[in-house]
């Protein structure tokens, strides 16, 4: 039997189980600043973040051929570093508040990267562990992703692209930060091992680097038991971490105004953090369009399982995101047997490759979005067909053992290539 593979995962995640071990403050200053900026300012609420990292841990902690250490950023820690062990996995949580605050003070990306206070802490932890491989989940969030820079000289390092921040369309749909862009580009330049597993992101990535080794690395999805709600309160729900333009909240409101012409009592629930400027724009949009009786805003939930329970109150999922390949919310709604409407991204049509599982509207076309909403409202037979097809598809894709087997195989090949120059089998590599 091969010796255990020592893996370090660098990421940013949070869930209820982890927070039980963390000394967390109330972040009163943060809430005060939010009030000054007119963004609500309600008491800070810690929430489940980045469930794909929870998935990774769940898949790996049951393996007997891997020794996993997770180094994660976390807001609100009362200490700079917290270490504990659960179910054979070692966790190091590192305070990230100062790193994110410095982004508003040090505008030069190169200097910010050098002065990021998380970097020496993470570097020291990695040296202590001395892993076989370091894996970075996401290159677009610099407070933690920049901590891998330099480690590639000592260890084989691979990054998993959740998205490509240096996407020309990003500035059209939301906030663009030059530090985020700079750090991501540095990671592209320095790390020869990558996992960019969607065609859209792969083509963008290859515009920056053409000679790296690209591997498959599936996320998987974690679900929780829910109680079915027979009497629905809403027709449609859009849910995400925060109310944002990139997640299509405004387009959902505009499309609802069209649907209301023939369905005056139609109801839409918008779930997500309300501490954003865009939330205020959405409130005004609802008033201007006379939808006060049709739209309900629900704040974000602390636990992801509570989000999943809440969305049971809606009949359909309206998820017109614009930058994602396929948002995790799509798979989540499909799993809970909610017929889904999305925009046509480069990824969403692939869901319908074998059977029609979701309805797809033309990108940023609210008339097309409204047409799909009417299909679900007026054609229950069609809605039921989509529901069944979608559930079958998501169940077939969510095999944690298969996902982790592939990742471990690839990680071992990377270690052998880095240390011994052993060629990586072509069948391990992913191209489009």
Place the predicted regions along the sequence by residue.
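Nucleotide-activated donor-binding/catalytic signature segment of Leloir-type glycosyltransferases, i.e.
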Residues: 280-301
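Conserved acidic donor-binding segment of nucleotide-sugar-dependent glycosyltransferases
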Residues: 354, 358-366, 375-380
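Membrane-proximal helix-turn-helix segments that form the acceptor-binding/catalytic region
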Residues: 55-56, 165, 175-193, 205-208
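A short, well-ordered alpha-helix in the C-terminal region of glycosyltransferases
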Residues: 368, 375, 382-397, 403
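N-terminal subdomain of nucleotide-sugar transferases
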Residues: 1-79, 89, 430-432
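Conserved donor-binding/catalytic core segment of Leloir-type glycosyltransferases
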Residues: 8-10, 195, 228-247, 253-256, ...
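Short hydrophobic beta-strand element within catalytic cores of glycosyltransferases
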Residues: 339-342, 359
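Aromatic "clamp/platform" in nucleotide-sugar-dependent glycosyltransferases that forms part
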Residues: 322
